[in-house]
Design a protein with these regions (language model features):
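Helix N-cap at the start of a conserved alpha-helix in ABC-type nucleotide-binding domains
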Residues: 175-177
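H-loop/switch region of ABC-family ATPase nucleotide-binding domains
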Residues: 199-200
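ABC ATPase NBD coupling module
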Residues: 67-86
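Catalytic Walker B motif of ABC-type/P-loop ATPase nucleotide-binding domains
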Residues: 164-167
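Conserved ABC ATPase signature
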Residues: 139-143, 147
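Helix-to-loop junction immediately C-terminal to a conserved catalytic motif
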Residues: 50
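A short, proline-enriched helix->beta-strand linker immediately N-terminal to the Walker B motif
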Residues: 158-162
Length: 222
């Protein structure tokens, strides 16, 4: 069963097409790496799936929720989208004035309306699961690149989305940390998560992904 189904997706920047006619299905528990040079549309595909950039044409279906061309998702559609999709950005985008733990439980309180005590308990469990439980009270500036990334993954997973999107996850990691990240993503996939990862890192894609898509000039070339 496909968690993500993209059909004839187009994304534009002004008058310029940055994504052209992309179609892909991703199954539950599958890791798909999207590769290509800078400017080929990798990140734009992820941002359209996440509802950050508008869809110019085509459709995106995530676990039964369909997005189509038009304005960005709002209201109940946006809330449903946030329950289905978590995104880890290249530079993590953690809130610098909040602890690692607070960064993770925030969405549980504001999106799922959980009591703060319950949200903190779940957030601690996620941080422990990802190997950074001892950094729960650290501020983002006190975290290493690998630690910050794991906190960002925990935050993206907090509301239990079936789909996780990652943009250039190895950019700030040394080779050892890249291997650890690949193992973490494989573990998440074995637990039933579906992952789509935009990356320049061919070795990481080979080790981590079940399938690799190559993008050229906004299209899936192979």
């Amino acid at each position: 069963m496909s968690v993500l189904a993209v059909r004839d997706l187009e994304v534009r920047r002004g008058l310029r097409h940055v994504v052209r006619g992309v179609s892909v299905d991703v199954s539950r528990g599958e890791i798909v790496a999207v590769m290509g040079a800078s400017g080929t549309g990798k990140t734009s595909v992820l941002r359209a799936v996440a509802g950050i950039d508008p869809i110019a044409a085509g459709t995106v279906a995530i676990d039964g929720l369909q997005l189509s061309a038009g304005p960005l998702p709002r209201g109940e559609t946006l809330r449903q989208l946030h329950r289905r999709v978590g995104m880890v950005f290249q530079f993590h985008h953690l809130f610098e004035h909040l602890t690692a733990l607070h960064n993770v439980w925030l969405a549980l309180v504001h999106v799922q309306r959980q009591p703060q005590a319950d949200a903190e308990k779940k957030a601690r469990a996620l941080l422990e699961h990802l190997g950074v439980g001892d950094r729960a009270d650290a501020m983002p500036r006190e975290l290493s690149g690998g630690e910050a990334q794991r906190v960002a993954i925990a935050r993206a997973l907090a509301v239990g989305p079936p789909l996780l999107l990652m943009d250039e996850p190895t950019a700030s990691l040394d080779p050892a940390r890249r291997g650890e990240l690949a193992a973490t993503l494989r573990q998440l996939a074995s637990e039933g998560r579906t992952l789509v990862v935009a990356t320049h890192d061919e070795e990481f894609a080979r080790v981590c992904a079940h399938r690799v898509l190559i993008m050229e000039e906004g299209r899936v070339a192979r």
